[in-house]
Amino acid sequence: MLGKAGSVVWMLCAIWVAADALTVETTQDILRAARGRSVTLPCTYNTYVSDREGFIQWDKLLRSQTERVVTWNFVTKKYIYGNRYENRVRVSNDAELSNASITIDQLTMDDNGTYECSVSLMSDQDVNAKSRVRLLVLVPPSKPDCSIQGEMVIGNNIQLTCHSAEGSPSPQYSWKSYNAQNQQRPLTQPVSGEPLLLKNISTETAGYYICTSSNDVGIESCNITVAPRPPSMNIALYAGIAGGVFVALIIIGVIVYCCCCREKDDKDQDREDARPNRAAYQVPKKEQKEISRGREDEDDHRHEDRWSSGRSTPDQPFQ
């Protein structure tokens, strides 16, 4: 009898403690909201304690640690914000009436993640009351960037790539192909996000390819034109490059030759300039007259000598 009575008392105490315990819950597991908008993370708590002395706290769960979002004190009504959440987060106006929800304004991609709501009361210090909710910030895909990897030469393999820099949730990618007559043709889809591989391309591969990037809140696309060329065009291209290089070498050689010839002419001119310029020297007119007069006197004197010499010679008798 005593043992049964003890069991009943223990059960009654357990029921009383459970009824008096603090509980916290979130009404939704996942919330979605667009970037730049506001979202309310729901959280409610239940307690039979009338004294609201304690605090409400929200944290963001990271891989190896937690990041404080906000702490709100029941008594002082003051906020303690995390580094990224100041002036962006507010607690419900009914915080003292079992509503521990918060509203986050101006959502960014960094707000994606799992959040934990906890309520602590002085009268329920032994109770660890927490609940979690996941926030997914929605961002439409940005216009994808399409590109070709490989040479568009008949017989080659090429890859078509498509990627959006932004998008939450992560965009899904799909491809469509149209021939030169604008007729859609069947295409084996790659795994979303992987390049589209085109093997042994030919004229049948020619046309344009459209990549579509989409998620829950938007859709964007880009297109690529595929025009395979014959291998001979590569030979012509290389020949053109070689011819251009040859012409460039000839031009450089002519320039070097002209420079060398000019340098040689400059040296010869310098050598010529170093010689005295005899033609440039002229005898003054006065001296020219004196020299001319002296020459005339000298000629007259020679003439007289020749004349006198001829007359003074006696005639020889004829034998």
Swiss-Prot record:
InterPro entries: A33, Ig-like_dom, Ig-like_dom_sf, Ig-like_fold, Ig_sub, Ig_sub2, Ig_V-set, Immunoglobulin_dom
Places the protein is found: Membrane
Keyword Signal: yes
Basic and acidic residues composition-biased segments: 267-276, 284-308
Ranges in the topological domain labelled Cytoplasmic: 257-319
GO CC, alphabetical: plasma membrane
Residues forming coiled coils: none
Record key words, sorted: Disulfide bond, Glycoprotein, Immunoglobulin domain, Lipoprotein, Membrane, Palmitate, Signal, Transmembrane, Transmembrane helix
PTM annotation, UniProt: Palmitoylated.
The UniProt record lists the keyword Disulfide bond: yes
Transmembrane segments: 236-256
Polar residues compositional bias, start-end: 309-319
Signal peptide interval: 1-21
Disordered: region residues: 267-319
Membrane topology: Single-pass type I membrane protein
PANTHER family: CELL SURFACE A33 ANTIGEN
Function, as annotated: May play a role in cell-cell recognition and signaling.
Protein name per Swiss-Prot or TrEMBL: Cell surface A33 antigen
Species whose genome carries this gene: Mus musculus (Mouse)
Encoding gene per record: Gpa33
